[in-house]
Every structure is written in C-alpha cells, then in structure tokens.
C-alpha cells in the first residue's frame, strides 16, 4: 500500500512540474516574450545589490559610472560560475544605470545562451553591436568575438566556424596579451564545440587557464575551469587543489562548494563531499528565500541534489538518498539535460529491488518532453520488465528507446546520441543474457563497461559506478559468474573505496568457494558501510555471511 501511494505521489509530482512549465504560456498568449529560456523575464530584470564572495572581476569597460562598472563586473563573475539568473540581473542593473554600456549586452547574450535561448542571445548581441561605435577597440573586438561564437553555436558541426571563432580570439589576444578575460574565452573555445564554456576542457585548455593565473594569480574563474579540465583528464589531485581555491575565492557561490565536493568524493572523502554539497544546498535555499525565486528556475539546484543524494547512496544511507531524490524529481523540468538525469530515480529503485516502482517511474519518464528522457525512460522500463520476466515487452521498450534516440543530436552541450548509447546497448545485452545468449550479452556489456568508464567528469564517474554494480547484479541473477566477476573487478578498478565493490567481490568469491577471499571482501564491505543505515539489507547480509565464513574456518 505504501509503495502504491509512492507511485501515485510520483505521478502527481510529475504532473505538477509539467503544469509549472506550461503555466506561463497558458496564462498569456505572449508568454514566450515574457521569458528568456525557462526563466520569466521579470526575474531577470529585478534589481539586486552588489554582493561579496562571488569572485573578483576587474574588466574595465566604457562607462562613466563606477556603479555601472561594478554591476558589470559582478555579472561577469556570475557568468564564470554559471549563475545565469544573477548574471542577467547584474547586467540589466548596469544598463539601467548606463543604457549605453555595450558590454553589458554582450554579458546578457552569454547569460541568455546559458538559459538556452539562442534568439534572446542574438537579440542582446544586436543591441551591443548598435552601441559599438561608442566603445573602445578592445570592446569592439569582444563584440565581434561574440558574433563569431554565436554563428558557430548555430552550426556546431561546422569546424570552419569554430576555427573562425578561435581565430577572432587569437587576433584580439595579439593586441592585448594581458587580457585575462580573453585568455579565459580562449580556454573555453578549445573545447570540442564553440558552445564550450569551461566544463569540457582538456589538456589543450589547461595551458590557457594557467596563462590566466600568470596574469591574474587569484583569478577564481581560471581555478574553476581548471577543476573541470583536470577532472576530464582524471587528474583528481590537481582538480582538488583548484577546487579548494575556487571555494575560498567565491565562497558565496553554491557552485564553488559543489565543485569542491566533486573531487572530495573522487578522493574517497565522501563525508567531506557531502558537507560541501550540503553547503551549496544551504546557500541555494537562503537565496531562494531572500530573492523570492523558485528553485525550479535554478539549473544548479537539482544537479547538486543529484550528487548529494548519490553520495548518501554510496555510503549506504539509502533513506536519506531517497528523500533527496524525491525532492529532485518534484522540480520542474527546464532542459533536456535535467529531464535525462531523472534516470537516477528508476535506477535507484531497481538497485533497491523495488522493480514495480521502477517500472512506474520509468514509464512516466518515457512520456517526457525531451527525446533523451523518453529514450532513457524506455531503457529503464526495459530493465524493469526483464527483471519481472516480461521479455517481449522489454524488447518493445528497447525498440522505442532506439527510435527516440534517433532524434538526438550527434554534437551539443547537453544530451547527445553518445550520452544514450551505452544505456541502450546495456539493455540490448541484458535481453541477450536473459534469453540464454550469454556470449553475445557478455561481449556487449564488456564494451558498455569500457565506454561508461571512459566518460569524463564526476557525474559520469558516479553514474558509471552504479551502472557497473547493476551489471554485476544482473550477471549474478542470470548465473553468468564470469561476467559477474569481470564487472566486480571493473568496480574495484573504478573505485576501491566503495562498499558495494567489495560486496560484489565477496559474492563472487563465495560462489567460487574461496573462503579467504570472501572473508576479506566481506570485511572490507562492512568497513566501508560503517555509517550505512542500520537496516541496510546488504549490510545485514554482509554480517551474516561474514559470520558464517568465520564459523566454518
């Protein structure tokens, strides 16, 4: 009865979130003009104060007002932390003080791209261009750079346009080698597409951000982007170093604490990571209360909750993990990325053995707004149906996932075909395993595991760990102990500090009648689950099996 209520509650929450997304359009036929992306324009135009702890920026622009200059700098600081709403508010406030501040329109254009509104971004740039005759040559070059970027963003597969964007920055740098904002842009531009904004940097980006630190040693933005770049290279210790600095220099920004939490978790310091994610959450809730802004409009809030909830799941605190996940799914969907990441909920339910609930949640997701969410909903519905022994229906879900997946772009900043592909292939492989085609399923899953582990970034790292665990669990269920051992050893290589890793290894050792290895693995699992829920079923099994192993020594 309780689980039936949970399923009904989830459906109601999802329906409410859809209502929130469409309410503006229903209330006013001109609602599209009243919002930028997914945020009401009224919010973006609200006045705000100058704030401390958001990161220091000192980029001189053409204005006679020191106050307008200060709000412009604050807007740029918020851009570098992806705080799109407050960046837009800061730039709009600067324009109220000085309507001819052309660079504020460039800032608005960048903020509007962050809010996923290319039309509004282009319109804001047009206003900057209209004012360009009255600004310095340096600012004129920046306006031209933004135009090149928008052209390239409108045609992401076009390598020539991406190259033209990078060349425009290079030409501007030739005229001013000490412009830290240009060096930051150049690092962003080194990403795989012109939409790069510091999240997907690599070894090539690092040199540009290191150059910024030579020009501006306490540049918080460079530290922020270096965290992402080092994470993408799996250089956790370097990322941690920059994360600590970013959190110190931008102490009022939730994302700064969140970023530090990323790598504390990767370093095995999960309780410290939880404290960092909690700090971000506290700052966010204080902001929503003081500014009277719904958390639904803040892209960062559900993202932070995702990492916080899965950190609790990692520790075996599944009750708190579930509470936080329910808080997340209650938020309105504002982007394809956000809706796609609602997959964490059915994945969690499957991991907890709550298959019927997982199927219900997956089918809701399969009716989502965006193709990526619909596809991943079908994938998890397929996994749930296979667990329930309903293979023909699971195959139908696989076909539906493939169909929706065809709508996804090959390139982009959010959900792409490559984001979905390992999940679809994982479902295909499970249909083979449960149909007796062990070799076919095993071969596919080994490649899936390789791809999951190759995806960079902290989100992918934790999601990959739980997917490896799910594969190991499925392998045990179908009696493929060779695959179960392979998956468990992949988990060990991926994260030796996870209790679930040692639990999976213990079950394999027990099956092989290797009492010494089983006893060692059970002891490690119990150690790492030392702060887990007291009634965690896996922990109870670990203790019972460990006791049995000891009694038969």
Language model feature labels by segment:
Residues 81-82, 115, 159, 193, ...:
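Structural motif corresponding to the intra-repeat A-B loop/turn of tetratricopeptide repeats
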Residues 67-68, 137-138, 217-222, 251-257, ...:
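Generic helix N-cap/helix-start motif at coil->alpha-helix transitions
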Residues 102, 109-133, 265, 274-285, ...:
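TPR/TPR-like (Sel1-like) alpha-helical repeat modules
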Residues 64-93, 147-158:
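Alpha-helical segment of the N-proximal tetratricopeptide repeat
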Residues 76, 110, 146, 188, ...:
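Residue-level recognition of tetratricopeptide repeat
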Residues 92, 96-97, 129-133, 173-175, ...:
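Solenoid-like repeat scaffolds
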Residues 73, 107, 143-148, 185, ...:
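"A position-specific structural signal for the A-helix of alpha-solenoid helical repeats
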